[in-house]
């Protein structure tokens, strides 16, 4: 018989207070016309430089790579697309490991399939990479980065990753500070390869690396710095507006049991899309994510089962009249939740895009049902579900099936009904992204959650069903994460079922999970590395 929730104390988590408070209220600087003019002038100079570089040349490959890593490629989308298409259509023979690896990575990043057989020229008859390559640090680094674009069953790229990782670790430990720029770049890559790095984080770190590279392009560097600072002003202004909204709700006081993480939510969504044209979408999505976080904590860290049953029903009804059926303390959050989606409807109905909100609501209902399912398991005498059952529910309850749909709502591009239907059917790339987020979250957080009476994690379920040790479960989950990344890479190969910009949102969302859950749950424990990342992206400007 189910345990009576009335006899259970609330499962309080005692999350630490907000790191930022209302700090960003004061960031109201507007981008000046002078700044816009200066950036536009540099942009046209860089565009000319890109167009005039010989097609397929080393010069053009290196320039495109620098643009992408410095965070300014969004200005030259069409030109880069054309250049990569030309490189793909007419590849040139080359025996330079750095150039072949760079060529391979750029082509695959753009969604074109290029065979990994291009690396066979660098291997012996036994399939092992030639030892002489260990003297080519730049080549090793490029091959290392290229290996993260691998898909399943690409043994040569598995070998490449193992080979380069081993030798780069050895090289960096013995490298003198005379090669400081390259040493920093190698160290950063070993910690966070390009494929898994959030675009703004990559831009911030690469500006410093690029500046210390003697071969850097002065105009491109200046442009990247100006653009970073100009975008930072826009992002600060957005966060100021969101902080005003959050302060007016007064939810930090009304829901003291929940994680007060508005700035962290914004950083998360900034990872999904940073470009100016997505300003509206970012603000909409940040509000949704912040309210989702409160709902998640209400389920996990405060409410009793008897309170959650009518709350779940109210979400499924999506009706202001349902507010009387839920606990008084839940009502402000429920009303604010409805208001966010009503605001979306008001804005999008004028553009004939009301159907987008319908799909977003459906995904949110599905997410809350998944939260409630976990509550039912916990209430049912601490029932431990089967691993497969828990996995299917966890892929939803992690939120990574809700966000890809909802983040499209405020975007300006044309997005077809078929794309939203495709997302609703849990495509492979979304399942892979969800698995990465859930597995990484469980690895770093499951022991803490069990201490406060949380539903059994996927790790506990796997250990119970398969008689595995904790370390065996960790190894299994890490392997699953690696394979999920390979699936994401494969889903980018053209022709794709949906526009590339939709897939890019899922990729960036996955990068956010990798960033936030790599060593610990940085969203919950936001005082450490996440605070430093936010500081570098949203507070500290780049010195010109």
From Swiss-Prot:
Catalysed reaction equations from the record: (2E,6E)-farnesyl diphosphate = (1E,4E)-germacrene B + diphosphate; (2E)-geranyl diphosphate = terpinolene + diphosphate; (2E)-geranyl diphosphate = limonene + diphosphate; (2E)-geranyl diphosphate = beta-myrcene + diphosphate
One Gene Ontology term of the molecular function aspect: terpene synthase activity
InterPro entries to which the protein is assigned, alphabetical: Isoprenoid_synthase_dom_sf (IPR008949), Terpene_cyclase-like_1_C (IPR034741), Terpene_cyclase_plant_C1 (IPR044814), Terpene_synth_N (IPR001906), Terpene_synth_N_sf (IPR036965), Terpene_synthase-like (IPR050148), Terpene_synthase_metal-bd (IPR005630), Terpenoid_cyclase/PrenylTrfase (IPR008930)
One Pfam family, short name: Terpene_synth
Residues noted as binding Mg(2+) 3 in the record, renumbered to the chain: 449
Binding residues for Mg(2+) 2: 296, 300
Comment, domains: The Asp-Asp-Xaa-Xaa-Asp/Glu (DDXXD/E) motif is important for the catalytic activity, presumably through binding to Mg(2+).
Protein name: Terpene synthase 9
